[in-house]
Amino acid sequence: MSPFTFRNSERGAVSVLTVGVFLILTLFVGMSTDFGIFLRYRRAMQNACDSGGLAGGLNLRTDPMTAAPTAERYAENDMRQNAIAWNALEATTLDENNQPTLIAPRRVRVEIHAGVPTYFLRLVQASVPVAVDCMARLTPIILGRGLEPLGLNYNAWDEYANTQGCLPLIQDGTPLAERTPPCDSFSITMSVSASGNPWGSGNTGMLAMQAPGATGDCFDDCPVGARQWMDTFIQGSPQSYCYDAARSPAVSDYTLNGQSCANVRTRPGTVTGPVINAVDARCDSGNPLDRIVVLALLNPAYTAEGGGSYTTEIWGFAAYELDCDNRPRPGAGTVTINGGFVSFVSMQAVGETTSFDTGVYTIKLIE
């Protein structure tokens, strides 16, 4: 072989090798790029699915007919914000056995199907089908210490959570220290009054709940003294209360095991000493969870009028974090508890789940 022929063969081999390496690198870059796009789409779709499931799950208890439409609406909004088109998006309400139902559903399932476009691999396939699904479950929880014998006017909660726009921060579990006013605090106020005065002066009043160590249910009437009230605040009521799902304007018969569990008795009058001592005990316990107290949100038709002791309905529950750096002190006829509302999920879901209906729920993603 002549030197000239050898050199030509060598140059040809180098050219083939260079082209081969270039094609391999191009294919690798293309696959990496398309795989990154695929992961981005799938993560965004999963987030949209989870968002829809949690949003729909919030309605399973109070308005089950709207659970699936709400889940779809929230999932669709997330998909649009991420500029992702979907081929199919559907939510279904299920019972405990994962069978579709609209009667007392316990779960909501969301499925999303979409085609993820390819770029470098478009010559092979224009898009890749991707499917995600998720399921949120309505789960009763065991409270850390039970409900506190304090009732809050539901309208005061609604003003704070909805009118002032604080509900998303509460649902997300955003710490109070990371919030901006007015969502970073909510003062509970009680007028120091005699038992004959109107109940609930301020936005809150004392409730007569079953005290620790007591036996027997007392949904309609639990007469307690100041010391019993303080012990109940410190330890939580051992009785399980629920809430009036229909939010009826009059005393309801919404029951738990045959008892009117949504009914609670007011305790007229406010005594400053037990309030201060009870908050001090919760703050000084050494357990951060003891700073979280669960309040009953009461039918505003009764918290706005009436005197003495009477029966009213619980319309809901809210977890409240005590501000232990700013504890209650006696004032001019008023005692104030400082703190703010926090999420059940982040702070109050302690203990094991139970099939016993406590009326207090959290929404959990289980798939």
List each model region and its residues.
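Alpha-helical assembly-interface signal, strongest on the long, hydrophobic N-terminal helix that forms
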Residues: S2-R73, L295
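N-linked glycosylation sequons
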Residues: M65-E72, E90-R107, F120-R122, A126-E367
